[in-house]
C-alpha cells in the first residue's frame, strides 16, 4: 500500500540517493544483498512503501537511477548497497550533459527520456496503490536540473493525480561549482513551479554550516552532507512506513503546507543534530527537540526564516512520546513567536508522531517549513542570472542546443513573480482585505 517510486538523476542526485537507500535499508533491516535480517515485525509491515519483494524473499528498492554519463552510477554500483538495486533500473547515456541545462532538457536528455519512462512505468505498475514519486537532483548542473525537470513534466502528464515530491539542491551563495549555475537553476525553478507538488530546498552551504557549527566536523565531506539530507528524507516518509499515533503522508503534507499552489518550496531541518562525541550525554526531551527544530541554524537551505514569516509548517516527530506534549510545544512556539507566523492562517503548524525512532536515537524530529524567507534564495539566484543574462554571457551554449532567448526571459520573470508573491503574503495582514490591489504594485 501507498508506495513511493524513487528517482535519482545526475551526479548529485545519485550520491544523495545512494546514501538515502543505505539509511532506509538499515531502518527496515535489509542488508546490501536485499535479504531481511531485522528483529521486529514492524520493519516488515509496510516495507513495500520503498521496496518490492522479489523471488526468494529479496527486497529490491523501487528506485530508478538515471544519468547522462556512466561514472557516478558505476560508483553507486560498487558502493556499499550497490548490489541491492534492480540492474534494469540503471538508465544512463555516455555523452554527459556538461553542466548544460539545454543538453539535459532538450538534446541528450530527450534521447534518453523514453527509456527512463519505460522503467518508471514498470515500477508504477508493480505498485498496489502508488502514492507518488520522489526525485533527488541538483539544480545547478545539467542532468539533474535539465533532464530531471524534463522527467518530472513527463511523469506529470502520465500520472497527473500522483504526488510529485522533489529534493532539490540549489546553488549555494558563496560556494559555486559551475559558472552557469544561475542559468540552470532559474530554468529549473521555472519548471518546478509548474510541475512539482512539493520541493524540499537544500543547499550545500547551509549543510556545510551545520556540519561545522553543530556537528563540529572540521573537514565535512559530501558523504556527511548527504547523510543529513537522507535523515530528512527518511523522516518525511516514516509515517507511511511505520505505525504512528498521528499519521502524515505526502498528500496530507501538501494539503497542510501549501496555501497557494505556486508557493510549494519548503525549508527542511532535522533534529537532534549533535556532534559524534556528545551524543551519549544528552537525554532528549520534546521541548529540546522543538527548540532545535525551530532554530534558524538548523535549516538546510541558505535562507534565514527570521527574515520572513511562516505561512505554514509541519513537524514530524519520531519515537515514544506523549502527543499532548508535542501539541503543547507546538502551540508554545506559535504563541511566543507569533510575529514570525502569518496571522491570517490560524494554527498553521501541523504535527505528526511516528512511534519508531531512527537507528541509534530515542527520538527525533523532522521539520518542514513554508516560509516567505525562501524568497532570499530565489532573489540571490535571480540577481546572478540577470547579471550574466544582461551581457548574454555563456548563452551560446544554450542557444546552440536549440533554446531560444525568450525561454530565459520567461524563466527570469517567472522567478521574479515568485519572489514578489512571497513578499506580498509576507506583508499581508488579516484585516486589510480591500487593500490588496494597491499592495501588488508596491511589491
Curated annotation (Swiss-Prot):
<dbReference type="InterPro" id="IPR018316">
    <property type="entry name" value="Tubulin/FtsZ_2-layer-sand-dom"/>
</dbReference>
<protein>
    <recommendedName>
        <fullName>Tubulin beta chain</fullName>
    </recommendedName>
</protein>
<dbReference type="GO" id="GO:0005874">
    <property type="term" value="C:microtubule"/>
</dbReference>
<dbReference type="Pfam" id="PF03953">
    <property type="entry name" value="Tubulin_C"/>
</dbReference>
<dbReference type="InterPro" id="IPR002453">
    <property type="entry name" value="Beta_tubulin"/>
</dbReference>
<comment type="subunit">
    <text>Dimer of alpha and beta chains. A typical microtubule is a hollow water-filled tube with an outer diameter of 25 nm and an inner diameter of 15 nM. Alpha-beta heterodimers associate head-to-tail to form protofilaments running lengthwise along the microtubule wall with the beta-tubulin subunit facing the microtubule plus end conferring a structural polarity. Microtubules usually have 13 protofilaments but different protofilament numbers can be found in some organisms and specialized cells.</text>
</comment>
<keyword id="KW-0206">Cytoskeleton</keyword>
<keyword id="KW-0493">Microtubule</keyword>
<feature type="binding site">
    <location>
        <position position="204"/>
    </location>
    <ligand>
        <name>GTP</name>
    </ligand>
</feature>
<feature type="binding site">
    <location>
        <position position="226"/>
    </location>
    <ligand>
        <name>GTP</name>
    </ligand>
</feature>
<feature type="binding site">
    <location>
        <position position="69"/>
    </location>
    <ligand>
        <name>GTP</name>
    </ligand>
</feature>
<keyword id="KW-0342">GTP-binding</keyword>
<dbReference type="GO" id="GO:0046872">
    <property type="term" value="F:metal ion binding"/>
</dbReference>
<dbReference type="GO" id="GO:0005737">
    <property type="term" value="C:cytoplasm"/>
</dbReference>
<dbReference type="GO" id="GO:0003924">
    <property type="term" value="F:GTPase activity"/>
</dbReference>
<dbReference type="InterPro" id="IPR037103">
    <property type="entry name" value="Tubulin/FtsZ-like_C"/>
</dbReference>
<keyword id="KW-0547">Nucleotide-binding</keyword>
<dbReference type="GO" id="GO:0005200">
    <property type="term" value="F:structural constituent of cytoskeleton"/>
</dbReference>
<dbReference type="GO" id="GO:0007017">
    <property type="term" value="P:microtubule-based process"/>
</dbReference>
<feature type="binding site">
    <location>
        <position position="142"/>
    </location>
    <ligand>
        <name>GTP</name>
    </ligand>
</feature>
<feature type="binding site">
    <location>
        <position position="69"/>
    </location>
    <ligand>
        <name>Mg(2+)</name>
    </ligand>
</feature>
<dbReference type="InterPro" id="IPR000217">
    <property type="entry name" value="Tubulin"/>
</dbReference>
<dbReference type="Pfam" id="PF00091">
    <property type="entry name" value="Tubulin"/>
</dbReference>
<dbReference type="InterPro" id="IPR023123">
    <property type="entry name" value="Tubulin_C"/>
</dbReference>
<feature type="compositionally biased region" description="Acidic residues">
    <location>
        <begin position="429"/>
        <end position="443"/>
    </location>
</feature>
<comment type="function">
    <text>Tubulin is the major constituent of microtubules, a cylinder consisting of laterally associated linear protofilaments composed of alpha- and beta-tubulin heterodimers. Microtubules grow by the addition of GTP-tubulin dimers to the microtubule end, where a stabilizing cap forms. Below the cap, tubulin dimers are in GDP-bound state, owing to GTPase activity of alpha-tubulin.</text>
</comment>
<dbReference type="InterPro" id="IPR013838">
    <property type="entry name" value="Beta-tubulin_BS"/>
</dbReference>
<feature type="binding site">
    <location>
        <position position="144"/>
    </location>
    <ligand>
        <name>GTP</name>
    </ligand>
</feature>
<dbReference type="InterPro" id="IPR036525">
    <property type="entry name" value="Tubulin/FtsZ_GTPase_sf"/>
</dbReference>
<dbReference type="GO" id="GO:0005525">
    <property type="term" value="F:GTP binding"/>
</dbReference>
<dbReference type="InterPro" id="IPR008280">
    <property type="entry name" value="Tub_FtsZ_C"/>
</dbReference>
<dbReference type="InterPro" id="IPR003008">
    <property type="entry name" value="Tubulin_FtsZ_GTPase"/>
</dbReference>
<feature type="binding site">
    <location>
        <position position="138"/>
    </location>
    <ligand>
        <name>GTP</name>
    </ligand>
</feature>
<feature type="binding site">
    <location>
        <position position="143"/>
    </location>
    <ligand>
        <name>GTP</name>
    </ligand>
</feature>
<keyword id="KW-0963">Cytoplasm</keyword>
<keyword id="KW-0460">Magnesium</keyword>
<comment type="similarity">
    <text>Belongs to the tubulin family.</text>
</comment>
<dbReference type="InterPro" id="IPR017975">
    <property type="entry name" value="Tubulin_CS"/>
</dbReference>
<keyword id="KW-0479">Metal-binding</keyword>
<feature type="region of interest" description="Disordered">
    <location>
        <begin position="424"/>
        <end position="443"/>
    </location>
</feature>
<feature type="binding site">
    <location>
        <position position="11"/>
    </location>
    <ligand>
        <name>GTP</name>
    </ligand>
</feature>
